[in-house]
Swiss-Prot record:
Pfam families in alphabetical order: GATase (PF00117)
Keyword Hydrolase found: yes
Active site residues according to the UniProt entry: C81, H195, E197
GO MF, one annotated term: lyase activity
Assigned EC number: 4.3.2.10, 3.5.1.2
GO cellular component: cytoplasm
Cell location: Cytoplasm
PROSITE patterns, A to Z: GATASE_TYPE_1
SUPFAM superfamilies xrefs: Class I glutamine amidotransferase-like
Keywords carried by this UniProt record: Amino-acid biosynthesis, Cytoplasm, Glutamine amidotransferase, Histidine biosynthesis, Hydrolase, Lyase
Gene assigned in the entry: hisH1
Protein name: Imidazole glycerol phosphate synthase subunit HisH 1
Length: 213
């Protein structure tokens, strides 16, 4: 049986994430102490809300250094929504805030308009398609292994991750033509801007692949 540990730090929809992993009979542990992090086989950092609040939650529980150590261990790591954003170096959401620095880059506002110059709704909410990126690696050996191009997943966000190295962008989505990082990857670490646990069969397939790493 595969096992996964989900960080419980007061910011995130833990139950829906846990249920998605339990769908595949995974053993799920909700992590509330630093010691549990390094003993995990796979680690998931969920999150909704503001970047600053998320980092404060991790700091309060003394999770920062154990997360960094886990990420360097080579074991599978997945950040979801805010969790993905916190993987980066910093965020400009309501000020300047330091992130985990697992992947170099910054979190910036989703553009307020499409490529045609027309304003669109912020936050970006709803189903959007996954597209390959020009410099990212092939999906065949990643958590997107069985995902057809242009599969739709569910987004809810006002900010987006911008890795410094475009090769870390595994998949994008286009919001009125504006490219947004949908999946990022650096060796054993993955981040999904969308919610796989809310993305139907496509999201479940991604979760299943993560359990098989």
């Amino acid at each position: 049986m595969s096992s996964v540990s989900i960080l419980d730090y007061g910011v995130g929809n833990l139950l829906s994430v846990a249920r998605a992993f339990q769908y595949f009979d995974a053993s799920v542990n909700l992590v509330s102490t630093p010691e549990e992090i390094m003993s995990a086989d796979r680690l998931v950092l969920p999150g909704v809300g503001a970047f600053e609040d998320g980092m404060k939650g991790l700091t309060t529980l003394n999770f920062i250094e154990p997360i960094k150590q886990f990420a360097r261990s080579g074991k599978p790591f997945l950040g979801i929504c805010l969790g993905m954003q916190m993987m980066l170096s910093k965020s400009t959401e309501f000020g300047q805030h330091e992130g985990l620095g697992l992947i170099a880059g910054e979190v910036v506002s989703v553009p307020s308009h499409g490529v045609d110059g027309q304003l669109h709704k912020i936050p970006h909410i709803g189903w959007n398609e996954l597209v390959s990126t020009s410099e990212g690696e092939d999906w065949c050996h990643t958590i997107l292994k069985n995902i057809p191009l242009n599969s739709s997943v569910y987004f809810v966000h006002s900010f987006m991750a911008m890795p410094s190295n475009p090769k870390k962008r595994l998949a994008d989505t286009l919001y009125d033509g504006q490219a947004i990082s949908a999946v990022i990857k650096d060796e054993n670490m993955y981040g999904c801007q969308f919610h796989p646990e809310k993305s139907g069969e496509v999201g479940l397939s991604i979760i299943q692949q993560f359990l098989q790493i």
